Amino acid sequence: MGMRMMFAVFLLVVLATTVVSFNSDRASDGRNAAANVKASDLMARVLEKDCPPHPVPGMHKCVCLKTCR
């Protein structure tokens, strides 16, 4: 193969790798966002169920009162 042909193949490989990497990053962001929402819902349920009668040191009152925004 000539030098130009090798350079063209190199550019195609770099382009293909970039496109695949970009698409997989976008897909994983969506999955991570969904996982974060599920995790926060789970934490809210656990805190709601196991809310102590007296606040735990470092825990804000709004967590048990469901007024946190």
From Swiss-Prot:
Which residue ranges run through the membrane? none
Q: What span is annotated as the signal peptide, if there is one?
A: 1-21
Q: Which cysteines are joined by disulfide bonds?
A: 51-64, 62-68
GO terms under biological process = venom-mediated perturbation of signal transduction in another organism
Q: In which tissues is it expressed?
A: Expressed by the venom duct.
Q: Which GO terms describe its molecular function?
A: acetylcholine receptor inhibitor activity; ion channel regulator activity; toxin activity
Recorded GO CC terms? extracellular region; host cell postsynaptic membrane
UniProt xrefs under Pfam families: Toxin_8
Question: What main location does UniProt list?
Answer: secreted
Keywords in alphabetical order, please: Acetylcholine receptor inhibiting toxin, Disulfide bond, Ion channel impairing toxin, Neurotoxin, Postsynaptic neurotoxin, Secreted, Signal, Toxin
In the UniProt record, does the keyword Signal occur?
A: yes
Which residues form the propeptide in this entry? 22-49
Q: Where in the cell is it found?
A: Secreted
What is the stated purpose of this protein? Answer: Alpha-conotoxins act on postsynaptic membranes, they bind to the nicotinic acetylcholine receptors (nAChR) and thus inhibit them. At 1 uM, the synthetic peptide reversibly blocks mammalian nAChR alpha-1-beta-1-gamma-delta/CHRNA1-CHRNB1-CHRNG-CHRND and, to a lesser degree, alpha-6/alpha-3-beta-2 (CHRNA6/CHRNA3-CHRNB2). At 10 uM, it reversibly blocks nAChR alpha-3-beta-2/CHRNA3-CHRNB2. In vivo, intramuscular injection of 10-20 ug of the synthetic peptide in goldfish causes death, while intravenous injection of the same doses in mice causes unconsciousness.
Domain observations: The cysteine framework is XIV (C-C-C-C).
Q: What does the record's miscellaneous section state?
A: Negative results: has no effect on nAChR alpha-7/CHRNA7, when tested at 1 uM. Also has no effect on nAChR alpha-3-beta-4/CHRNA3-CHRNB4, alpha-4-beta-2/CHRNA4-CHRNB2, alpha-4-beta-4/CHRNA4-CHRNB4 and alpha-6/alpha-3-beta-4 (CHRNA6/CHRNA3-CHRNB4) (at 10 uM). Does not inhibit potassium channels.
What's this protein's family per the entry? Belongs to the conotoxin A superfamily.
The name this protein goes by in its record: Alpha-conotoxin Pu14.1
Organism name: Conus pulicarius
